[in-house]
Amino acid sequence: MKILAKGNGNGNGHAMFIGRWQPWHKGHRWLIDQALNEGKKVLICIRDVEADEKNPWSPIEVMLNITNELIELIEEGRIKIIIIPDIESVNIGRGIGYDVIEHVPPQEIGEISATKIREGKI
C-alpha cells in the first residue's frame, strides 16, 4: 500500500474504488479485500461506460455480477455499490480530508487480466 495523498478523515467513511469491473474477477476481489481487512467499509463505483469490445456488460449487469459474489458483505453493511457517470480524471486539492491510496498487488494477482478473461484465455 502506498499513500499518495494524506487526508484528515475521521475513519468513519468508506474506501472508494472506481472501475469498469468488466468482468469482476479475483484481482478485483483482492483489491477490495485490502480495505475490508483494515476494517473499512467499501464503496464500489461502477463507471457507466459505453458498450464496446472492452465493456460488453451494462452497468446494471456488472452490479448484479458483483452483488452475487459480495451479497453477504452488502447485507452486513460493509459494502455499497453504485453506478456513476463515466469519468476521465480524479482530481484532488490540498486539505482533501481523505487519503489517496495505491494498493500494489502481488505478482500473481497483478497478472490477472480482464481482457484475457473476456477473450476466454483464462
Predicted features and spans:
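Nucleotidyltransferase catalytic core that binds NTPs
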Residues: 1-122
